[in-house]
Amino acid sequence: LMMLLPLAASAQGGGESVSKHFNMFVKHHTKILIDAAESMPADKYGYKPTAAQWTFGKIIAHMAGDNRITCSAIAGVAPDKSPEPSATASKEELVSALKGSLTFCEQAVAKVNDGMLAGSVTYYGQRATRVSPLIGLVEDWSDHYSQLAGYLRLNNVLPPTAKNGEM
């Protein structure tokens, strides 16, 4: 919710564009998500705090797959039909898949301007405004970064946003 406040403020005529704030969010989260994925030791990609939770690798695999769907909607193109990476793939394969999906998202969001936000796109098989997958992206990345940061801490690894007072 805190991530959406600048968006609401700019929509009230603050002078800055809403799409600029989405771009800032995507650039920042691309960096911290990649840093988080790279920070976890390869032998801990199978780690999960409880039996009911996903492994660290599953979260990375899920994000790589889900980003293709969400960012295809943002771009207004059909999603890539390739399957989500395996949760048991190597760290290198998972980080590579995540990086590729994040690059695709950066490119998709960079093409969006404020005039496009109310435009119609297909998002998970439904018609929606383009702002719907953008908000979904903010929500999803914030949720999963929080998971990754918790998993890192449980393995004595400092999360990227805890280093140098970064937020």
Question: Model-found features: residue ranges?
Answer:
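Short, flexible helix-adjacent loops and helix caps
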Residues: 41-45, 75, 110, 114-117
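Residues within well-ordered alpha-helical secondary structure of globular protein domains
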Residues: 39, 62-65, 100
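Short, contiguous alpha-helical
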Residues: 23-34, 44-83, 122-167
